[in-house]
A protein has these predicted regions:
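Positively charged, small/polar-rich N-terminal and surface patches that mediate targeting and assembly
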Residues: 1-113
């Protein structure tokens, strides 16, 4: 694989403690950095912002916790390491409402890594 191949790692993680653990994991792995954004999932919007649907809260596990979206441009090898760490922190994403992680190819990138 060429040295310039990059992927965008996208993770949505529920809970402040989990996102702190993920950031510690990024530092321990020596990953170049990440952007962390506050995020709202459909369950959070439906169950809190639309009172008419508040009865559906039970359909959206984890809707009471804050959500964070983590974005990082990484090499494929770094993505593998980061996903393993995220799975460890988030208990393999087995519980509904814990979060998700995936990556997409980056076709063009400008800036330092």
């Amino acid at each position: 694989m060429p040295d310039d191949v990059r992927q965008l790692l996208i993770a949505v993680v529920k809970g402040h403690r989990r996102v702190e653990a993920v950031m510690e994991g990024f530092l321990e792995l020596g990953l170049p950095g990440a952007t962390v954004l506050d995020a709202k999932g459909m369950g959070q919007i439906v169950s809190t912002d639309l009172p008419i649907f508040s009865g559906f809260r039970s359909l959206f596990p984890g809707s009471g916790e804050e959500s964070y979206m983590i974005l990082s441009v990484l090499t494929p090898e770094q993505v593998t390491e980061a996903v393993a760490m995220l799975r460890d922190v988030c208990n393999d994403f087995q519980e509904k409402g814990t979060g998700v992680v995936f990556s997409l190819p980056v076709l063009d990138f400008h800036g330092p890594l």
